[in-house]
């Protein structure tokens, strides 16, 4: 892999046609180091080949040597051939205009948003903004999203996105249970809630022992539930005045969640104004394509009293070291990476890229533009309703915004067939009912076409003309629900309506951030590798982006073939027997895997097995997921080398033998080494009746070289947004497939509510759509198809090679905390800065912030060990970039040395004051005990290419003590 181009005939060697075809050319572009660079790194490490290095790193007992056959995808496809093959699959899909609704709508993505966000690597290759100083652009965009949701829902505070509406509702249920001291264990769901949402809620409730009751909204108070879920508007279109119901629920000791349509909220009373305590929903119709179900940004907004119990990311406003406004992630102590099994949720990746798109849709249109879109949709719906009633059809919903449900008698199938023939999908609302949901793409012609479809081919009455019916159509939601409160009044939603202004605003935000389009992002455990352009191109093809998740099967043949092929690819890579792509984040894959284990035990009459063993080094999502799955966490100790303490494991497995459900391990370990005893771990747990969950977060170190399904794993989740090249999007989207052994295949998730049943024994839906974030699956398909088995294996080998090269070169300067056999690491390494901090006061945070002055994103801070930095360079970085990072780290170590020898003041030095903004460096007054040049240009190369952090070090304590999670008043900008 990465061989030099073949010599030409004039050079004396005539290349073969196979060499000229260069079928593996993509692998040479994906893998950063070329052959000479690889040989150089191997020489530094003392090995003569990649194979020799890998043999030294990976235990022989688990080493994979079968070449990882993948059927027709074993050999790589050139980029153009892979695109052509995928285009052929896409062509098997049928793109109809879907008026199905049920939470998903056609939408018009503004071209300026599509090109400059969705298709822009400055946005889609960024990471979650844990380092706020180099993330100010997307943090501002996320804050816009929060402001948009807060305004439209009429509540006090919103988070920065949820995975989808179904999981948002499930999270709201558990939130209300946490904050409500009501003795009840019942959660009441109105019978007009979206069916896919109800299924996800039921799935979440079952392991937690929550009883879900379903019935009319009017009966909610009588249920004496701790919480009530109301759909607003309902699935059949009704716009209900819930004021009295909310009052009655509150009087009975309950709390209220509204699942609300954001576009409808521009015209109807906000949930917070009629008594809802929490609002959830989907922002998809704000410019995000259907995508066969995702990815889309769900949302959650709550009353101020519940802000510390809210799940997911929350952007807040703080000040930097100079007292200037800055954005940051707020209240992180409630999240899984800190609170573990006590966290409010297991959410890690959410849907930031899609939330940014939705927020920019609102910025682009502004409040008046959104209202105009909503009014037009409602007017067309009212016109459609009046015409169908003229034709003799009975409408079952007295009120509506955009959705109608009509009685069709025995003509239902014929109407559906006629609609399909005209290129339109309608909602199946029962044997004798049809639902129609209009959206911003609907036209006058669509309304007339629907009249003709319902008329069974008979000519429309002469009196039934669009203009005549439209002129008489009236608003069809209760007058007392007409919205009177203002929304989106902040200048950001009222300024950027000219496209030049919008374009420059997006550019200004992007320029504030560091993403992979500027520099490597060496985040350990995060695998920030190349997201190739050819992989991204198919995502916006209409055949993938414009398909409704509940479209008829015959319209999604290409999607399902692609999904089947991708599942087979992932089975080949992992050694498992079956895969589900439904989980739309790694955390959801974990959760699904644990539910599958529970279902398996229950099928054997052992539902009492509820103990989950988790090593102390585990990622925070592991214990959080176990708690959500109804399991009790028992921590297993790790030894001084970071490995699972086999003696402690054996003791605890024996102690809990009768109730042992599973162990969750990460492999290679979160400490970045291949533990020698992994098979022994699996054997101990299996001997006591448990299942082995192998967290696939570090699968980038195993593809082609080891397989969890071969060395004892029973179930794993994968992160397609790590190992298989889906970009991180600044904090989502992600895909977290769950892969299982043959004995667990029957328990993979269904989505019965929308007709997706994989197996009668399958667990309930864990995502709202049957295939989760389906529209980004082509990214991973393209990556695997273009790499082939040998290319994927070479990628793994190079990921291990680059990590060991970085560790080797940095080890004289920083202690490498953990190594495996032969003193080597896996695909990442941990630098221990604790001794330096003890000696000099310079912390890992100081080093992380100083790296920004050198133009780098910091490695992972304090995970899995406090006071450390974890580095994962991936296979995609060329030697030049690796050396640039290494040189920066060495230069920083020399700066620390100057603190040690006293030539830098212990408190007034470039590390303690990092990062340095242009404003600070160019200020008239400079009183620091080091030079401006030392601050801004610590290495000469920065003079030709310099990134300036837009803010100084963010004050986290101030931000949490003075929590402010809405757009900053313009007066604040004027002061900056």
Swiss-Prot record:
Species name: Cupriavidus pinatubonensis (strain JMP 134 / LMG 1197) (Cupriavidus necator (strain JMP 134))
The Enzyme Commission number assigned here is 1.4.4.2
According to UniProt, the name of this protein is Glycine dehydrogenase (decarboxylating)
GO MF: glycine binding; glycine dehydrogenase (decarboxylating) activity; pyridoxal phosphate binding
Q: What Pfam families does this protein's entry cite? A: GcvP2_C (PF21478), GDC-P (PF02347)
Enzyme class label:
oxidoreductase
Keyword check for Transcription, yes or no: no
Q: State the similarity comment.
A: Belongs to the GcvP family.
Going by the UniProt record, its keywords in alphabetical order are:
Oxidoreductase, Pyridoxal phosphate
């Amino acid at each position: 892999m990465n061989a030099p181009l073949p010599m030409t005939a004039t050079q004396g060697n005539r290349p073969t046609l196979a060499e000229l075809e260069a079928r593996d050319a993509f692998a040479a572009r994906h893998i950063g180091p070329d052959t000479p660079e690889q040989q150089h790194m191997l020489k530094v490490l003392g090995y003569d080949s990649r194979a020799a290095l890998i043999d030294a790193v990976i235990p022989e007992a688990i080493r994979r040597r079968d070449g990882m056959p993948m059927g027709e995808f074993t050999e790589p496809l050139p980029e153009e051939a892979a695109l052509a093959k995928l285009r052929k699959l896409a062509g098997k899909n049928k793109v109809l205009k879907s008026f199905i609704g049920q939470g998903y709508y056609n939408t018009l993505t503004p071209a300026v948003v599509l090109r400059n966000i969705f298709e822009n690597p400055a946005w889609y290759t960024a990471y979650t903004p844990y380092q706020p100083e180099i993330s100010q652009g997307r943090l501002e965009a996320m804050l816009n999203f929060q402001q948009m949701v807060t305004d439209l829902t009429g509540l006090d505070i919103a988070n920065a996105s949820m995975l989808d509406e179904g999981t948002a509702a499930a999270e709201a249920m558990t939130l209300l249970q946490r904050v409500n001291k009501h003795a009840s264990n019942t959660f009441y769901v109105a019978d007009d809630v979206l069916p896919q949402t109800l299924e996800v809620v039921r799935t979440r409730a079952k392991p937690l022992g929550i009883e879900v009751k379903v019935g009319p909204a009017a009966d909610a108070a009588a249920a004496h539930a701790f919480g009530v879920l109301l759909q607003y508007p309902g699935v059949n279109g009704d716009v209900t005045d819930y004021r009295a119901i909310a009052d009655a629920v509150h009087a009975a000791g309950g709390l209220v969640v509204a699942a609300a349509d954001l576009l409808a909220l521009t015209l109807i009373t906000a949930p917070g104004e009629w008594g809802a305590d929490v609002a959830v929903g989907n922002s998809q119709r704000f410019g995000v394509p259907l995508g066969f179900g995702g990815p889309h940004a769900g949302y959650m907004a709550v009353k101020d009293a519940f802000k510390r119990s809210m799940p997911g990311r929350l952007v807040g406003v703080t000040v930097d070291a100079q007292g200037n406004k800055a954005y940051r992630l707020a209240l992180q102590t409630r999240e899984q990476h800190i609170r573990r099994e006590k966290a409010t949720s297991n959410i890690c990746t959410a849907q930031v890229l899609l939330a940014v798109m939705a927020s920019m849709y609102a910025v682009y249109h502004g409040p008046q533009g959104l209202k105009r879109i909503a009014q037009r949709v409602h007017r067309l719906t009212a016109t459609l309703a009046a015409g169908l009633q003229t034709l003799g059809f009975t409408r079952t919903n007295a009120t509506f915004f955009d959705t109608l449900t009509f009685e069709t008698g025995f003509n239902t199938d014929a109407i559906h067939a006629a609609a399909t023939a005209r290129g339109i999908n309608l909602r199946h609302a029962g044997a004798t009912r049809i639902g129609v949901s209009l959206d911003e793409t609907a036209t006058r012609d669509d309304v007339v076409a629907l009249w003709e479809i319902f008329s069974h081919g008979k000519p429309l009455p002469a009196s039934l003309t669009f203009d005549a019916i439209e002129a008489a159509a009236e608003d069809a939601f209760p007058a007392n629900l007409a919205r009177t409160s203002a929304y989106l009044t902040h200048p950001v939603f009222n300024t950027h309506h000219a496209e030049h202004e919008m374009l420059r605003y997006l550019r200004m935000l992007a320029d504030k951030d560091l993403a992979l389009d500027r520099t490597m992002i060496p985040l350990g455990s995060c695998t920030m590798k190349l997201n190739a352009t050819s992989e991204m191109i198919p995502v916006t093809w209409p055949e993938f982006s414009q398909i409704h998740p509940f479209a008829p099967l015959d319209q999604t043949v290409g999607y399902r073939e692609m999904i089947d092929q991708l599942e087979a690819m992932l089975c080949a890579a992992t050694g498992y027997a079956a895969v589900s792509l439904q989980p739309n984040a790694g955390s959801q894959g974990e959760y699904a895997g644990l539910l599958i284990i529970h279902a398996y035990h229950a099928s054997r009459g052992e539902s009492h097995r509820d103990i989950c063993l988790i090593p102390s080094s585990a990622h925070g999502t592991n214990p959080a997921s176990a708690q959500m799955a109804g399991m009790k966490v028992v921590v297993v100790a790790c030894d001084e080398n970071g490995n699972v303490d086999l003696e402690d494991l054996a003791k605890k497995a024996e102690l809990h033998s009768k109730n042992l459900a599973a162990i969750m391990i990460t492999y290679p370990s979160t400490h970045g080494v291949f533990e020698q005893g992994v098979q022994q771990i699996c054997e101990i747990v299996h001997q006591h009746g448990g299942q082995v969950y192998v967290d696939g977060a570090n699968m980038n170190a195993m593809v082609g070289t080891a397989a969890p399904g071969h060395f004892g794993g029973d179930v794993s989740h994968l992160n397609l947004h790590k190992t298989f090249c889906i970009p991180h999007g600044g904090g989502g989207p992600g895909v977290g497939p769950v892969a299982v052994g043959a004995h667990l295949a029957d328990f993979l998730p269904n989505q019965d509510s929308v007709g997706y049943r994989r197996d009668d024994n399958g667990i309930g839906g864990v995502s709202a759509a049957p295939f989760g974030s389906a529209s980004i699956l082509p990214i991973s398909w393209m990556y695997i198809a273009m790499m082939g088995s040998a290319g994927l294996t070479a990628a793994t080998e190079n990921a291990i090679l680059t990590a060991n090269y970085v560790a080797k070169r940095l080890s004289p300067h920083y202690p490498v905390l953990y190594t495996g056999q032969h003193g080597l690491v896996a695909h990442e390494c941990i630098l221990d800065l604790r001794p330096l901090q003890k000696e000099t006061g310079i912390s890992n945070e100081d080093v992380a912030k100083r790296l920004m002055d050198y133009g780098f994103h910091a490695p992972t801070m304090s995970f899995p060990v406090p006071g450390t930095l974890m580095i994962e360079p991936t296979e995609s970085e060329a030697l030049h970039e690796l050396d640039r990072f290494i040189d920066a780290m060495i230069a920083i170590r020399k700066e620390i040395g100057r603190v040690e020898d006293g030539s830098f003041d212990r408190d007034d030095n470039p590390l303690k004051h990092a990062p340095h903004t242009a404003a600070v460096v160019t200020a008239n007054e400079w009183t620091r005990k080091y030079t401006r040049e030392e601050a801004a240009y610590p290495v000469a190369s920065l003079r030709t290419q310099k990134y300036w952090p837009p803010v100084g070090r963010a004050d986290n304590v101030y931000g949490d003590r003075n929590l402010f999670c809405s757009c900053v008043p313009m007066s604040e900008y004027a002061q900056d």
